[in-house]
């Protein structure tokens, strides 16, 4: 009896052998489940990656557009501040000439012009005083020859105002982009124009080096003529958007003509424009779209890598 009882216990402890058909059935069921769940999982992962990429791209694009607009605003403020500062200096010189008696004393006037010659490097050649006969007074150290003074833009514009203001941009004899600040002197006995020429080199420096957004670039355009006044690419300066064969610049010209200051995407660049107060100038700032989305592209690559690893683990575990 004891022997039979022991045998019964041993029989109970023995695992029943699976029938080959049962084993095949279970493997087939697992394969079917995996065949259904794996595609669904892959679709879900792809959808999640696409959603994450889209949301991240929109957020980064929005943030970058705001940063580009801020950068253009800061540059525009710097250009306007420079123009206002130089114009204030011209007004100070005008006030000094009028209230020191220099407008009625030729010797004192000549001395003043000599003193102001080295006032500021931005004032190319110092200051000029031109009468209605076309006679020009200038600093003794200024060797520039001025012919047909009455035909010069600074003379013609100066006749229209007492308070000094800027002329449109013009090229000097050496093909440098210049502007003049000019206005009539307060002299009851003689009509005379006070003027000075300013180089746009300082403006060019602001346009090229004061971009706060990494990877962004700017150029300054005269809206009335389409001429490029400042650019990091020196070969573009003094060329016209109206004559360009560059597709991007053509689209920029259209944007300027429409007075469109919104942030827009032109070809492969995000672009914003800003008008410079008191001038016909428009600052154009732009950044490659690829530079903005590069961080999102890196995130997408990481997500895809994680997804692939996760799918492999999921497949192996099932």
PLM features: residue spans?
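N-terminal sensory and localization modules of signal-transduction and trafficking proteins
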Residues: 1-27
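Extracytoplasmic/periplasmic sensory segments of membrane signal-transduction proteins
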Residues: 16-19, 66-165, 210
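Extreme N-terminal signal-anchor transmembrane helix of membrane signaling/transducer proteins, especially
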Residues: 23-58, 62, 304-314
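Extracytoplasmic/periplasmic sensor domains and loops in membrane signaling proteins
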Residues: 107-111, 140-171, 234-263
């Amino acid at each position: 009896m004891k022997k039979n009882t022991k045998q019964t216990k041993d029989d109970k402890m023995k695992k029943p052998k699976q029938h080959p058909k049962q084993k095949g059935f279970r493997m087939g069921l697992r394969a079917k489940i995996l065949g259904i769940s794996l595609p669904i999982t892959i679709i879900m992962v792809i959808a999640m990656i696409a959603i994450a990429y889209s949301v991240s791209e929109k957020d980064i694009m929005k943030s970058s557009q705001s940063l580009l607009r801020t950068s253009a605003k800061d540059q525009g403020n710097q250009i306007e501040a420079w123009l206002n500062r130089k114009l204030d200096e011209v007004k100070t010189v005008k006030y000094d000439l009028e209230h020191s008696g220099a407008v009625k004393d030729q010797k004192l006037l000549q001395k003043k012009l000599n003193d102001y010659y080295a006032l500021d490097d931005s004032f190319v050649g110092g200051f000029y005083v031109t009468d209605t006969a076309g006679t020009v007074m200038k600093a003794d150290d200024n060797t520039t020859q001025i012919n047909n003074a009455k035909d010069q833009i600074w003379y013609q514009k100066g006749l229209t105002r007492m308070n000094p203001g800027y002329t449109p941009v013009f090229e000097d004899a050496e093909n440098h982009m210049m502007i003049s600040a000019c206005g009539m002197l307060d002299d009851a006995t003689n009509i005379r124009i006070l003027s000075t020429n300013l180089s746009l080199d300082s403006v060019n420096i602001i346009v090229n080096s004061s971009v706060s957004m990494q990877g962004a670039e700017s150029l300054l355009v005269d809206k009335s003529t389409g001429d490029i006044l400042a650019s990091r690419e020196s070969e573009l300066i003094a060329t016209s958007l109206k004559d360009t064969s560059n597709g991007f610049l053509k689209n920029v010209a259209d944007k300027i003509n429409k007075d469109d200051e919104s942030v827009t995407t032109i070809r492969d660049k995000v672009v914003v424009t800003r008008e410079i107060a008191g001038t016909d100038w428009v600052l154009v700032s732009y950044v490659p779209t690829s530079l903005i989305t590069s961080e999102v592209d890196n995130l997408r690559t990481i997500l895809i890598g994680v997804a692939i690893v996760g799918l492999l683990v999921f497949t192996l575990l099932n």
